[in-house]
């Protein structure tokens, strides 16, 4: 696959090298570096992928996706983006052949009730004949396979990997939990949700490692409703109007 194919839905600047090179795999973990890989440098809460740019290049990576300057050999392609987390999401979709576009995806967000709601919807859809995948706090379910979950909403690469496996397994629908962290960190960027569901909002997840304040928490929850066709609101929740403010979807 050419690097340019992974970048086709992104705006970017070629700092050195060429976007026409062939790449072997897409990674954002420096420990997985290999010959021909494209490495997406992400600045995280614990470490900054840009610090490992030279190490990854020395292991044979062909290209780096960066937000900051990096010092690597001239034969390594360097592509600069405004937001590498967002880039990883769209590149992952391209890498797996845009599997989300072959599925009807329902996303559930809210402080409480996401897990229960996903299993209820999965059961209802299966009862009327759909084959349904699931991604959530407890596990991902792909056909008969169950994969224990590390995060409520996995990293974008993993999400699209699961979507691709679901398509291969014959699924036509997916129900997934969408956390505020997942939305804030662009893990779900570019996913065409058919339906977004809001359960409720409480004062959890406020702190230095999550959301700086309740306003930020509300704003991040609302991001789901900028990328779905239909939003379903729990109007008994006092914050539902704030969450849906600025929504781009039809709301019921």
Q: Which residue stretches match the model-derived regions?
A:
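N-terminal leader/targeting and accessory segments in enzymes
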Residues: 1-90, 226
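Residue-level signal for inorganic ion chemistry
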Residues: 6, 37, 56, 91, ...
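Short loop/helix-cap segments at secondary-structure boundaries that form the rim of catalytic
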Residues: 33-34, 68-76, 141-143, 186-192, ...
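Acidic, Mg2+-coordinating active-site environments of NTP-dependent enzymes
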Residues: 71-75, 169, 194-252
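Walker A (P-loop) phosphate-binding motif
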Residues: 93-139, 145-146
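Flexible beta-alpha connector loops of hexameric P-loop NTPases
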Residues: 146-156, 204-212
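Conserved nucleotide-sensing/catalytic segment adjacent to the nucleotide-binding pocket
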Residues: 150-179
């Amino acid at each position: 696959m050419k690097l340019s194919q992974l970048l086709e839905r992104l705006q970017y600047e070629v700092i050195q090298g060429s976007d026409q090179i062939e790449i072997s795999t897409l990674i954002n973990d420096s420990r997985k570096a290999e010959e021909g890989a494209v490495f997406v440098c992400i600045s995280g809460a614990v470490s900054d992928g840009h610090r490992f740019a030279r190490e990854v290049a020395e292991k044979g990576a062909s290209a780096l996706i960066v937000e900051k300057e990096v010092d690597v050999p001239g034969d390594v392609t360097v592509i600069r983006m405004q937001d590498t987390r967002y880039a990883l999401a769209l590149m992952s979709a391209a890498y797996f052949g845009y599997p989300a576009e072959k599925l009807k995806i329902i996303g559930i967000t809210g402080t409480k009730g996401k897990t229960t709601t996903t299993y209820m919807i999965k059961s209802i859809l299966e009862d009327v004949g759909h084959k349904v995948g699931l991604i959530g706090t407890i596990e991902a379910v792909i056909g008969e396979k169950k994969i224990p979950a590390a995060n409520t909403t996995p990293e974008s690469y993993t999400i699209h990997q699961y979507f691709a496996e679901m398509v291969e397994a014959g699924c036509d629908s997916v129900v997934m939990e969408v956390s505020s962290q997942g939305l804030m960190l662009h893990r779900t960027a570019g996913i065409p949700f058919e339906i977004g569901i809001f359960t409720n909002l409480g004062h959890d997840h406020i702190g230095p490692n999550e959301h700086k304040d309740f306003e930020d928490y509300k704003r991040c929850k609302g991001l789901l409703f900028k990328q779905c066709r239909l939003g379903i609101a729990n109007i008994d929740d006092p914050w539902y109007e704030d969450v849906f403010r600025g929504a781009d979807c039809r709301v019921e």
